Regions:
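Charge-rich, low-complexity N-terminal segments
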Residues: 1-134
Length: 134
């Protein structure tokens, strides 16, 4: 019987953003996005979960060091202490909601991870998170 095991790695980054549509006036942006229609920041937590069979030689699904390297290279270096609307090329033209950032993170990570990506969870605050699942 084959058993599939999932492992999750967490990383953190701090970033600023604004939720707005430039073609809308301030009143409409405030109605839709509330206080988030003004520049503000978050201390984000991202959880990356991969899945696979446990390697009989190493006892691991994937080496966490390798997963850390991918997360750092593909996400943290691009996002940490940046303004998501202005500074991050892969978010250009996208409203950087938690949902959109989580989806973009999935697209960045998936081709580089050493095991099958099954979940990306972006925690924006203690009350807000977005999750992309396979």
């Amino acid at each position: 019987m084959t058993i599939t095991v999932s492992i999750t790695r967490r990383a953190t980054f701090a970033a600023a953003h604004i939720l707005c549509r430039p073609e809308w006036d301030e009143e409409r942006n405030d109605q839709v996005f509330g206080r988030c229609a003004r520049d503000h920041g978050h201390n984000y937590v991202i959880e990356v979960t991969v899945s696979g069979e446990v390697n009989s030689e190493t006892g691991m699904v994937a080496n966490l060091k390798d997963i850390d390297g991918v997360i750092r290279r593909e996400l943290i270096e691009a996002l940490d202490h940046r303004h998501l609307n202005r500074d991050v090329e892969f978010l250009r033209g996208v409203i950087p909601t938690a949902e959109n950032v989580a989806a973009a993170a999935w697209r960045r990570l998936e081709p580089h991870l050493p095991a099958r990506l099954v979940r990306v969870r972006l925690i924006e605050s203690e009350n807000n998170s977005a999750e992309v699942v396979a």
